[in-house]
Amino acid sequence: MIISNLHFDINDMILDDIEKHSKSALMQDIFFKILRLSKLESHIILVGEIGSGKKRLAQIIHENSNRADGPFQSFYCVDITENDYKDAFWGQLKFGKTNIELRYDILEKAFNGIIYLDQFSELPYSYMRDILDSYLKGCTQLFRYNKTVQPRLIISLNQESYHKILGTSIWKKMLDELDPVLIMLPPLRERKEDIPVLIDHFINEIKKRSQDFKDLKISSKALFECSNYNWPGNIRQLKNAILQGAVLSYGQTIEREHLPFSMSWKLPYEFGEKKSS
């Protein structure tokens, strides 16, 4: 069985039309707000647990905004160095044959589109402050060089880090200088009615990618287990569980024993191993 073509990005699989028809009242309310906020020019802060779909929501905001024809520039903030963010956000003098230009890499790439600061809360506070200052200063300086560059910011914060920065000077700076709209994403365990919908979507996506999985489905027992699990890794973890089940079931029916052992109440010997005496 060929499975190499099953290694796809989680963002290719979630929060498209399937999520716009979410059964969860929480998500329906969020999508209603997002569709209205998309048309505004406000900066946005998305707060949610890891794997809850913040990046895809940012893309949906972009796709439904007046900036949809502009770029969507994502900047992943985890494990970056000081040089990484300075190269992206600080102004650099570029020496041409006939002139000297001030260039801001990510600001000019985003132009009048959107910059998505992915997991911004994982940065040291000094880096956060520098990036915000560079964004505001860069837009002003580029305007002086007759370059009208004003990308909109969407910032994602992990739930735990969000609570840590509340009340800090960097949080006050974000509120004062960006005047953002705050959107809180619910974890998957608070919207369990969407789990069967997402599983069905993931299975259909897997079927599209390989004929080896054209008969793929999930058993009622496996679906029950998925629907009653807390999913600490949220949508990303659910996707990975279904992907594992698809491979271990050889593209047939995903049973409980094909799901990750970490989410099962079964003991090891119940998976076919003999109980030790």
Describe each model-derived feature in a short phrase.
Residues 128-136:
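Conserved Walker B catalytic segment
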Residues 95-101, 135-141, 164:
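Short gly/ser/thr-rich secondary-structure transition/capping motifs
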Residues 271-277:
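Short, intrinsically disordered, charge-balanced linker/junction segments flanking boundaries
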Residues 114, 120, 133, 153-154:
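Hydrophobic helix-rich structural segments at or within alpha/beta enzyme and signaling domains
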Residues 21, 75, 138:
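ATP-binding "lid"/motif region of the histidine kinase catalytic
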Residues 33-97, 108-122, 187-192, 241:
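Conserved post-Walker A coupling segment in P-loop NTPases
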Residues 121, 136, 179:
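Short acidic-aromatic loop segments in the C-terminal HATPase_c
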Residues 2-17, 23-28, 32-39, 49, ...:
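Nucleotide-binding/hydrolysis machinery
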